[in-house]
C-alpha cells in the first residue's frame, strides 16, 4: 500500500544548506584565492596549465553558488527537494570523498584540506531536509 508524503511548506534544512554553501563560496573566494590561486598564477607553470586551473577555480565558485541557489529554491518548493538532495547533495558528497581520499594520499590525513567538513555538512543537511520533508 502506497502512502503519500505530505510535504512541509518550508524546509529549514535546505535553507541551512543554502547558507552553508553561500558561506563556503565566500570563504573559497576571499580566503582561498590568495592562498591557492595567487601563488599558482605567479608560478612558472605553462600558461595553459594556469588557465585550466583558473577555470577550475571559478567553476567551483559557480557550483557552490548554484548549489546555494538551488537549495534556497528547494527550501520553499517541495517538488525541488528530491532533485536538489540527489544532484547537489550527491555532488557535494563526492567532493567530500575527494578531499578525504586525496588528503589521505597526499598528507596521510584529511585535515590539511578540511573543506570536506563543509561539503559533508551541506550533504547531510540536504539529505535530512529531504527525509524530514514529510509532515
Positions of PLM-derived features:
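Membrane-helix boundary connector in multi-pass membrane proteins
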Residues: 78-79, 90, 96-114, 127-135
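Cytosolic juxtamembrane helix and N-cap/initiation of the first transmembrane helix
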Residues: 1-24
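Juxtamembrane helix-break-helix junctions at the cytosolic face
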Residues: 3-10, 68-86, 130-133
Amino acid at each position: 500500500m502506497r502512502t503519500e508524503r505530505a510535504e512541509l511548506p518550508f524546509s529549514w534544512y535546505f535553507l541551512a544548506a543554502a547558507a552553508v554553501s553561500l558561506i563556503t563560496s565566500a570563504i573559497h573566494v576571499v580566503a582561498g584565492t590568495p592562498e591557492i590561486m595567487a601563488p599558482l598564477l605567479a608560478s612558472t607553470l605553462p600558461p595553459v596549465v594556469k588557465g585550466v586551473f583558473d577555470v577550475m577555480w571559478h567553476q567551483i565558485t559557480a557550483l557552490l553558488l548554484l548549489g546555494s541557489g538551488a537549495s534556497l529554491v528547494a527550501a520553499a518548493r517541495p517538488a525541488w527537494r528530491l532533485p536538489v538532495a540527489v544532484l547537489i547533495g550527491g555532488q557535494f558528497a563526492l567532493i567530500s570523498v575527494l578531499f578525504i581520499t586525496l588528503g589521505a594520499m597526499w598528507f596521510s590525513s584529511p585535515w590539511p584540506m578540511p573543506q570536506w567538513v563543509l561539503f559533508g555538512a551541506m550533504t547531510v543537511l540536504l539529505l535530512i531536509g529531504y527525509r524530514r520533508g514529510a509532515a
